[in-house]
């Protein structure tokens, strides 16, 4: 209701739900629920990995067939370069985007803002730009 009241006519449903949108049954459920509500068009994202755990590739082909428009482990980086490489290969084959959460948690964990003069002045642990850049560069090379 809120999206439509604000003039929004379409929304992307991210996969970080319970249950995680990591298979065709959940993708189909999300689509049907959106259609039944009839307010805004709902475009489901599928998870890249099963359970958004970053261990096993989710069934991308099946989720595309069920209506997934893109893939993401929404809020969680895919740490495995091999898993991301395979996901990107599927994305290319099915012409769907991957929305990666680019953040190296070994650098970012515990950070609350961008690293810099202000984080130092406030005494807060900053997140270095490299935490994002490492994953961006990796994924560009893998793509």
Regions found by a protein language model. Give the residues of each.
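Gly-rich Lys/Arg/Thr-decorated short loops/hinges at beta-loop-alpha junctions or inter-strand turns
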Residues: 8-13, 39-43, 115-124
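Metal-associated gating/positioning segment near the N- to mid-region
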Residues: 1-37
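Histidine/acidic residue-rich metal-binding segments in metalloenzymes
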Residues: 55-143
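Alpha-helix-loop-beta-strand connector modules within alpha/beta enzyme cores
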Residues: 24-45, 89-100
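Active-site beta->alpha loop and helix N-cap motifs at the rims of alpha/beta catalytic domains
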Residues: 47-53
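Structural motif
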Residues: 14, 45-47, 74
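Surface-exposed, flexible loop/turn segments at secondary-structure boundaries
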Residues: 19, 50, 106
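Divalent metal-coordination and catalytic microenvironments
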Residues: 3, 7, 42, 71, ...
């Amino acid at each position: 209701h809120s999206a439509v009241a604000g003039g929004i006519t379409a929304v992307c449903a991210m996969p970080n739900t319970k249950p995680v949108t990591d298979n065709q049954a959940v993708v189909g459920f999300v689509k049907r629920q959106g259609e039944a509500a009839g307010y805004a068009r709902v475009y489901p994202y599928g998870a890249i990995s099963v359970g958004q755990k970053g261990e096993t590739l989710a069934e991308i082909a099946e989720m595309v067939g069920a209506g997934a428009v893109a893939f993401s482990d929404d809020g969680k980086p895919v740490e495995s370069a091999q898993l991301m490489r395979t996901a990107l290969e599927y994305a290319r084959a099915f012409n769907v985007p991957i929305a990666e959460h680019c953040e190296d948690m070994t650098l970012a964990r515990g950070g609350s803002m961008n690293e810099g003069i202000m984080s130092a002045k406030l005494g807060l642990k900053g997140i270095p730009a490299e935490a994002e850049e490492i994953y961006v560069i990796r994924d560009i090379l893998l793509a």
